UniProtKB/Swiss-Prot annotation:
GO terms for cellular component: cytosol. PANTHER family: 1-D-DEOXYXYLULOSE 5-PHOSPHATE SYNTHASE-RELATED (PTHR43322), 1-DEOXY-D-XYLULOSE-5-PHOSPHATE SYNTHASE, CHLOROPLASTIC (PTHR43322:SF5). Keywords: Isoprene biosynthesis, Magnesium, Metal-binding, Thiamine biosynthesis, Thiamine pyrophosphate, Transferase. The lineage of its organism: Bacteria, Bacillati, Cyanobacteriota, Cyanophyceae, Oscillatoriophycideae. GO terms for molecular function: 1-deoxy-D-xylulose-5-phosphate synthase activity; magnesium ion binding; thiamine pyrophosphate binding. This is 1-deoxy-D-xylulose-5-phosphate synthase. Catalyzes the acyloin condensation reaction between C atoms 2 and 3 of pyruvate and glyceraldehyde 3-phosphate to yield 1-deoxy-D-xylulose-5-phosphate (DXP). Homodimer. Pathway: Metabolic intermediate biosynthesis; 1-deoxy-D-xylulose 5-phosphate biosynthesis; 1-deoxy-D-xylulose 5-phosphate from D-glyceraldehyde 3-phosphate and pyruvate: step 1/1. PROSITE patterns: TRANSKETOLASE_1, TRANSKETOLASE_2.
Length: 635
């Protein structure tokens, strides 16, 4: 059977080990070809091919439920659940999503993009099953660092207290998240990987006793106590913590041995209550360069499959925002030992690996633990340090209570640097950084700013470090800057709450925020071709808003447009409208941004076009919205 013939996972049930191994080879081939062409996550999926095949041969996925943690591990799952023939559209507009989506397939039982959610979701399904009197298996597959997340441990704590609730947790232990795992849990798992399988000891103990001359022949049920005692001794050295939490522990199992995996999963399904199967895998399995460099090949842009090297750019590009941020932070930290960079398992993505390389004592990786990262920063700030929490906008959502309760109520000077703010592209709705403006600006003792380009970002990094009167957040987009000149040092801090005028005009006032400022300038240029003269303001701050600048301009010009790469509800445009109303400046306002909808995966430019946020589209909206007031304009 060829992989292309598999349209339903039940077709795996009658395949031999040899046939499954051939399917595994073909899955890796398809996985590699697709990611090399379109980009995407590489190492995680390559590491779970046999795990997926072995597990699915023991399940009926028309009935049984499988919940994949994080989601980017699930490429093999997608390939064998009816998506082989359109897998080439991975992460492309209107194509296969890079993460799990319930609306994409009936086999995507629970959506996932963020880490550590699978056990909670699986336990909820198992409890619902029991309440309804149904009978199906529930399997939560967690790994790629997700077990370091507090939510996963909370779910284990709860599940272990429910001995009659059947749930199987499969730990995909590849020793990694995006970067190598950190912390005591990771160290404990590494010890477990080196130990013999507990279930093997338990299952073979009786047989070994029977082979002992004389003694073996008299093996009786009374000797079960000895058998149990030996099992407890083994567990005490390996899975003691898991067993003490109420789970039956099995493993470690070779995650690339199909026969061993199938046997183990079949055994696990027969054990009542919560069961954890510990599977040891190799991230990037089957592609040597990915096995050797697990960090770089966690995810890749399109690359040369033969060499593993990135495809050359058509022309040189300006540095990425994250690179400029990291370089600036390192320069400042070299002269200020109080600066401490904090990441939640995203050192490479945020650029903090550069700080780790230069100043390891001023760097902390807490693992996938955003809540802990924020309160840790609060503790550091309370002792006079200058903590810088470097985190993707979408992941800071997970620590919202800590921002309010532990940082802002106590007015502690924590600097939040929000990478991937705005439209992120191919990662889709789970990773869009749409909401930070709205969820941060409503908190007292919080300053919120955004640079118009990479040069202003350098100044804002200094501004954030120097700000000690409460918390401050800086949002900046994914991708490359505009190529503006950068300084190695000597940056000037920006006065808190002060914007700047970039262009003057009397017909319409355009207020751009962050990544939309250059688009505002381009829009103004298009408007000028229609005879409309626009004033363009780089707002810089959404909180505090520069009302001293904005209110007189709005009053004089009489027509206001706001532009933001974030949600309109509660966003920058809302802040401007509130300020105008509160100060009795009653002028029409056109807010341009992301409406009340989820933004699916696509290239950022494609998403902006879908949302009407290209300069030409915004110019047209302005002309149409203010047409009665611009009656002399040739629209």
């Amino acid at each position: 059977m060829h992989l292309s013939e598999i349209t339903h996972p039940k077709q795996l049930h009658n395949l031999s080990i040899h046939q499954l191994e051939e399917i595994a080879r073909q899955i890796r081939e398809k996985h590699l070809e697709t990611v090399a062409t379109s980009g995407g996550h590489l190492g995680p999926g390559l590491g779970v091919v046999e795990l997926t095949l072995g597990l699915y041969q023991t399940l009926n996925l028309d009935r049984d439920k499988v919940i994949w943690d994080v989601g980017h591990q699930a490429y093999p799952h997608k390939i064998i659940t009816g998506r082989y023939h359109n897998f080439h559209t991975l992460r492309q507009k209107d194509g296969i999503a890079g993460y799990l989506k319930r609306c994409e397939s009936k086999f995507d039982h629970f959506g996932a993009g963020h880490a550590s959610t699978s056990i909670s979701a699986g336990l909820g399904m198992a409890l619902a099953r029991d309440m309804k009197g149904d009978n199906f298996k529930v399997v939560s597959i967690i790994g790629d660092g997700a077990l370091t997340g507090g939510m996963a441990l909370e779910a284990i704590n709860h599940a272990g207290h429910l001995p009659k609730t059947n749930i199987l947790v499969v730990l995909n232990d590849n020793e990694m998240s995006i970067s190598p795992n950190v912390g005591a849990i990771s160290r404990y798992l590494n010890k477990m990987r080196l130990s013999p399988p507990i279930q093997f000891l338990q299952d073979n103990l009786e047989e070994q006793f029977k082979q002992i001359p004389f003694v073996g022949e008299t093996f009786t049920p009374e000797m079960e106590g000895l058998k149990g005692g030996m099992k407890r001794l083994a567990v005490s050295k390996v899975g003691a913590v898991i067993e003490e939490l109420g789970f039956t522990y099995m493993g470690p199992v070779d995650g690339h041995n199909l026969e061993e995996l199938i046997t183990t999963f079949n055994q696990a399904h027969q054990i009542p209550g919560p069961v954890l199967v510990h599977v040891a895998t190799t991230k990037g399995k089957g592609y040597p360069v990915a096995e050797e460099d697990k960090v770089s090949y966690h995810a890749q842009n399109p690359f040369n499959l033969a060499t593993g090297k990135a495809l050359p750019a058509s022309k040189p590009k300006p540095p990425k925002y994250s690179k400029v941020f990291a370089h600036t932070l390192v320069k400042l930290a070299e002269n200020n030992p109080k600066i401490i960079g904090i990441t939640a398992a995203m050192a490479t993505g945020t650029g903090l690996d550069k700080l780790h390389g230069k100043l390891p004592k001023q760097y902390i990786d807490v693992g996938i633990a955003e809540q802990h990262a924020v309160t840790l920063a609060a503790g550091l700030a309370s002792e006079g340090m200058r903590p810088v929490v470097c985190i993707y906008s979408t992941f800071l959502q997970r620590a919202y209570d800590q921002i309010i309760h532990d940082v802002c109520i106590q007015k502690l000077p924590v600097f939040f640097c929000l990478d991937r703010a705005g439209i992120v592209g191919a990662d889709g709705p789970t990773h869009q950084g749409m909401y930070d403006i709205a969820y941060l600006r409503c908190i007292p003792n919080m300053v919120v700013m955004a640079p118009k380009d990479e040069g202003e970002l350098q100044r804002m990094v200094l501004t954030g470090i120097k700000h000690t009167d409460g918390a401050i957040a800086m949002r900046y987009p994914r991708g490359n800057g505009y190529g503006v000149p950068l300084m190695e040092e000597g940056w000037e801090a920006i006065t808190i709450g002060k914007g700047e005028i970039l262009r003057n005009g009397d017909d319409v006032l355009i207020l751009g925020y962050g990544s939309m400022v250059y688009s505002a300038m381009q829009t103004a240029e298009i408007l000028s071709e229609h005879g409309v003269a626009a004033t363009v303001v780089n707002a810089r701050f959404v909180k505090p808003l520069d009302t001293e600048l904005i209110l007189p301009l709005a009053q004089r010009i009489g027509q206001v447009v706001t532009m933001e790469e974030g949600c309109l509800m509660g966003g920058f445009g809302s802040a401007v409208t509130e300020a105008l109303m509160d100060n009795n400046v009653l002028v029409p306002v056109l807010r341009l941004g992301v409406p009340d909808k989820l933004v699916d995966h696509a290239k950022p430019d494609e998403s902006k076009a879908d949302l009407g946020l290209t300069p030409s589209q915004m110019a047209e909206r302005i002309l149409q919205s203010f047409k009665p007031r611009l009656s002399t304009i040739n629209v």
